């Protein structure tokens, strides 16, 4: 079985920096360290309120990342304009609410199909591979396929936040079924949100999963063990799942 890829989300390096309005820690340096430790790509979310990653970060990271940039963004004209100018390798369209602490759910592709389709077309025409961050629902997968996105990213938050084993098992099987269904439609399947060192292996073991995007758990561990070790440890957990 092919190795599952790891996209390291470095948003929270910027969160720490912005908490004091300093120039450090720098997400550009974090991306370099993560890549050296085995990250297959770097994920950043340029939010409309610029609460962590800034336009400056996006510009510099595009010039310095040695692997692949995955730019998460809302479905807005401003963000599509930025992406078409920067030209990251990947864009992941996500829902966004100003008052949320983190992304709370998947993108409702069905409810805004025309808007999403237009964004997908503009990004694709610019040579960018597009992913849609959606819940593990067949109807949303069908809609993602219909608007022309080649990738989806399954929202794993409900699985990660499950209160007990029964609930987690139910959510795992939803993700598993969604991954199988999406792959049968010809979509490439990524997953992410809330994954940790303790719950990542079951998701990484699913043969349809191409890449996992993980940030908070890695940055949290990095506080105590360093970013190099934190990224390497996550890669180890993911590799174990594919043995």
From Swiss-Prot:
Keywords: Cytoplasm, Pyridoxine biosynthesis, Transferase. This is Pyridoxine 5'-phosphate synthase. It comes from Photorhabdus laumondii subsp. laumondii (strain DSM 15139 / CIP 105565 / TT01). It comes from the Bacteria. Pathway: Cofactor biosynthesis; pyridoxine 5'-phosphate biosynthesis; pyridoxine 5'-phosphate from D-erythrose 4-phosphate: step 5/5. Its EC number is 2.6.99.2. 3-amino-2-oxopropyl phosphate binds at residues 9, 20, 194, 215-216. 1-deoxy-D-xylulose 5-phosphate binds at residues 11-12, 47, 52, 102. Belongs to the PNP synthase family. SUPFAM superfamilies: Pyridoxine 5'-phosphate synthase (SSF63892). GO terms for cellular component: cytosol. InterPro entries: Aldolase_TIM, PyrdxlP_synth_PdxJ, Pyridoxine-5'_phos_synth. Homooctamer; tetramer of dimers. PANTHER family: PYRIDOXINE 5'-PHOSPHATE SYNTHASE (PTHR30456:SF0).
């Amino acid at each position: 079985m092919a190795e599952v890829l790891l996209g390291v989300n470095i948003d929270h390096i910027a969160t720490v920096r912005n908490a004091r309005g300093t120039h450090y820690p720098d997400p550009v340096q974090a991306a370099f360290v993560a890549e050296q430790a085995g990250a297959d790509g770097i994920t950043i979310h340029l939010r409309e309120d610029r609460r962590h990653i800034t336009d400056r970060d996006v510009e510099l990271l595009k010039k310095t990342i040695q692997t692949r940039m995955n730019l998460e963004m809302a479905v807005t004209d401003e963000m599509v304009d930025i992406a078409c100018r920067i030209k990251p390798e990947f864009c992941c369209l996500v829902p966004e609410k100003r008052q949320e602490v983190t992304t709370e759910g998947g993108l409702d592709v069905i409810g805004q199909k025309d808007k999403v389709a237009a964004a997908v077309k503009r990004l694709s025409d610019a040579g960018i591979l597009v992913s849609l961050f959606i819940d593990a629902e067949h109807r949303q997968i069908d809609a993602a396929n219909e608007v022309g996105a080649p990738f989806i990213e399954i929202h794993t938050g409900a699985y990660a936040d499950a209160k007990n084993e029964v609930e987690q098992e139910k959510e795992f099987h939803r993700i598993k079924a969604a991954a199988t269904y999406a792959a049968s439609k010809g979509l490439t399947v990524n997953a992410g949100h809330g994954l940790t060192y303790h719950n990542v292996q079951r998701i990484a073991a699913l043969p349809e999963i191409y890449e996992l995007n993980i940030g908070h758990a890695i940055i949290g561990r990095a506080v105590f063990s360093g970013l190099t070790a934190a990224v390497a440890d996550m890669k180890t957990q993911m590799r174990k799942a594919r043995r």
